[in-house]
């Protein structure tokens, strides 16, 4: 993969016109990302939803909750998934997807989302199965408490020092990124909008697994006790990081 410098396709007329963002997956995988994790990553998969929700699985566990496409709001004029969760703090909506693994030692993931109405919590998770082990990582945003947690080696959540605000008065799209190092079984960093936090040395949740090598990302929203909540998921980007 080409991660830096002038690409080998420079000044060559493309043979195929790209019409939708899903079409760039193969191109990105071969040529590398232009701007992911400070230009230090190669894109391996991009999930967007202008062609529908066929690339993901979506569930809602409470009557009245639902997941559907909307263009109000839109992200750069493209539809997003509206994860509508009813007024119940234990009510959850989930959107997730699986894929085949890629042989590498470090990975990153970026979630682009907006949230309207103050949710109880938002979970963004990444699981890799490779080499006979399963590695679980995740970031939790406690919207009502303005907190951030990471999924620790014991399978529970550890708070990250600081105050992290997810505005919910109108649909402002945020970027949440985190990177993990499989080889050293640790987190590397998390980036939430303008917040850059090092998690080097924080161990992943690791367990033996006989499952086929694969990855799985998940977004969960847990509702408010007062009002229905909307999480608008615009895109998910998976990368291999160059370290």
Task: Say what each PLM segment does.
Residues 2-62:
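Extracellular carbohydrate-recognition regions
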Residues 49, 109-111, 170-182, 188-192:
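Short tryptophan-centered beta-strand motifs in secreted/extracellular beta-sheet-rich domains
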Residues 53-89:
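Extracellular glycan-recognition surfaces and repeat-rich motifs
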Residues 96-109, 164-172, 229-232:
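Extracellular/lumenal carbohydrate-interaction signature centered on repeated Trp-anchored short motifs
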